[in-house]
Amino acid sequence: VQSALLRMQYAIENLNGPCVVPGMTGTGKSALIRYFAAEYPRLRPFVHIVFPALSADELTRMILAELLTDTDVAVPASREAVFREIRSALRRHTLQGRRPLLFFDDAHQLSDEALLQTVLPLLTLAESDPNIQLSVILAGQPILLPRIRRFGELSERVTAASPLHGFTAAETSEYVQQCLQLAGAERPLFSDDALTALHDVSGGIPRRINRIGDMALLVGFAEQRTIIAAEQIESLAGELLPNAA
């Protein structure tokens, strides 16, 4: 996650084209979205595209609607007019000291049409106009990167590919301890063997760690255990993640 974060920061701060963030479900893409929204107040407007499975025209119009500061301005009907308004809106934000960020969540769901008729023209527009500062992040399942590489014009503009992988065993242990401290725990609640088991059964994927760890604490509380052991983790993993075993 740290490596992906650093690459994304570099791409954004240097306006080096779009950053592609491929990763399995639960590897932390949503956490990165929250981080950039909170830590980079200059990245405004922060346009978070949650449902990208739209036609190119629908997606382009949605982006314009998010960029417009005057809610009374109507989104034009023609595609050419929509892109003219997008250019004007991006110039206006840049002139006022802001840097818009387009964050495409689940970007693997973007159609080829949307990639070539919405995303690519937006990148070309930003490249060709010195009065526009625009950052673009495409986050999605691992299939996203090979899809983008199919299109030369789009692929050559990608300056950072930041795959999200699961935590290492040490990172899993550190993550769990930090979560417990934030929750007010004053002593370890998982044995070392339990932390190792938690990493093994979760693959280091944060969402799985949270799911199994939370249930282990709940069951441990009900059974009045003072510490969670590896056996409890393995038993719960079989119930909660039968396909991951």
How would you label these PLM feature ranges?
Residues V1-I12:
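Pre-Walker A adenine-sensing motif
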Residues Y35-E39, P142-T159:
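Short regulatory helix/loop adjacent to the ATP-binding pocket of P-loop NTPases
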Residues H165-S191:
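Conserved small helical "lid"/interfacial subdomain of P-loop NTPases
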Residues P45, L54-A74:
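Conserved NTP-binding/hydrolysis module of P-loop NTPases
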Residues R87-R91, L95-L138, I143-R149:
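Conserved Walker B catalytic segment
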Residues G26, V73, L101, Q181-A245:
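C-terminal alpha-helical "lid" subdomain
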Residues I49-A53, I148, T159-T172:
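Conserved AAA+ ATPase "SRH/arginine-finger" region at the nucleotide-binding site
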Residues N14-Y35:
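Walker A/P-loop nucleotide-binding motif
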